[in-house]
């Protein structure tokens, strides 16, 4: 998101826009993993397209978005246990 555009089209406090984006994406099964990165266990690309279509209908979003991308994760590896086995606490 372009912050100056968010301030212009969404208003202040503009950071509430991120909460609204999250709520919309949750309707389609997305969950936030880090910052503005969202994942979904549903591999149906039509679901992704519907989410993007819904976001595009939000005027302040369409006017403020800097970059939006989608990709399919073919094989997801979780290395948390590998790292945590050396933890001291």
Curated annotation (Swiss-Prot):
Cleaves ssRNA, mostly between U:A. It comes from the Bacteria. This is Endoribonuclease VapD 1. Its EC number is 3.1.-.-. Keywords: Hydrolase, Nuclease, Plasmid, Virulence. Pfam families: CRISPR_Cas2 (PF09827). GO terms for molecular function: nuclease activity; RNA binding. InterPro entries: VapD (IPR016368), Virulence_VapD/CRISPR_Cas2 (IPR019199). Homodimer. Transmembrane segments: none annotated. Belongs to the VapD ribonuclease family.
């Amino acid at each position: 998101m372009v912050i100056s555009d968010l301030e212009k089209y969404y208003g202040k406090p503009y950071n509430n826009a991120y909460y609204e984006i999250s709520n919309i994406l949750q309707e389609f099964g997305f969950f936030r993993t880090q910052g503005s990165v969202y994942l979904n266990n549903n591999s149906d690309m039509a679901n992704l397209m519907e989410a993007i279509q819904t976001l595009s209908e939000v005027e302040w979003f369409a006017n403020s978005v800097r970059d939006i991308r989608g990709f399919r994760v073919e094989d997801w590896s979780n290395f948390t246990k590998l790292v945590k086995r050396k933890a001291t606490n």
